[in-house]
């Protein structure tokens, strides 16, 4: 059900795998939790996890110094993967990542200290159904999005039901990507929404 997930990439001997760490513990082998699958994540994330790590393991440009990965998925299956490295990313990495993105049908961003390489786009489009209407959202890498899209649809439906008999104007502070703003706008004369996060 989680539409996003973040993992460390753990290198041990010749093997590489997804990892998390015990809550409140220092990131180390003693607190390591291997995550070949992550049942709390969306089906599309779980389907991609083994394919991504197996493909990256075959290519030294993708494998070497790969430190962490962030997955962001949409209900449609569209996927944005951010691969985070402890090395400078060059043209060889970019070529390898472009091939990987084509093979897996995903969007990839490469990150390293002071670097962000966007291969195609740095967002996905999510479509949420609220009381029979579809709302399209651009969800940008690094910005906040509701982690559970189906629960989000129910939250938006509840908010619209409550707002149905209201009138006047709506002021929304910290609106993010307009998650509540768009569906609620149907119930008000004018809407003013603000956000401090530039990525949202």
Tell me what each language-model feature is.
Residues 1-200:
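Accessory RNA-recognition modules of RNA-modification enzymes
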């Amino acid at each position: 059900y989680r539409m996003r997930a973040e993992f460390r990439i753990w290198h041990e001997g010749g093997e590489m795998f997804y990892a998390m760490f015990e809550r409140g513990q220092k990131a180390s082998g003693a607190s390591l939790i291997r995550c070949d699958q992550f049942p709390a994540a969306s089906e599309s994330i779980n389907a991609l996890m083994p394919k991504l790590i197996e493909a990256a393991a075959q290519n030294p440009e993708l494998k070497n110094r790969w430190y962490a990965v962030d997955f962001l998925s949409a209900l449609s299956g569209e996927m944005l993967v951010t691969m985070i490295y402890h090395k400078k990313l060059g043209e060889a990495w970019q070529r390898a990542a472009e091939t990987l993105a084509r093979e897996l049908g995903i969007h990839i961003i490469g990150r390293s200290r002071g670097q962000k390489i966007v291969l195609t786009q740095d967002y996905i489009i999510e479509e949420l159904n609220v009381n029979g209407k579809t709302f399209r959202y651009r969800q940008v890498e690094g910005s906040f999005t509701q982690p559970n899209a189906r629960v989000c649809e129910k939250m938006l439906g509840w908010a619209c039901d409550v707002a149905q008999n209201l009138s006047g104007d709506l002021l929304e502070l910290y609106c993010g990507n307009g998650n509540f703003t768009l569906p609620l706008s149907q119930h008000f004369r004018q809407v003013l929404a603000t956000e401090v996060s530039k990525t949202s």
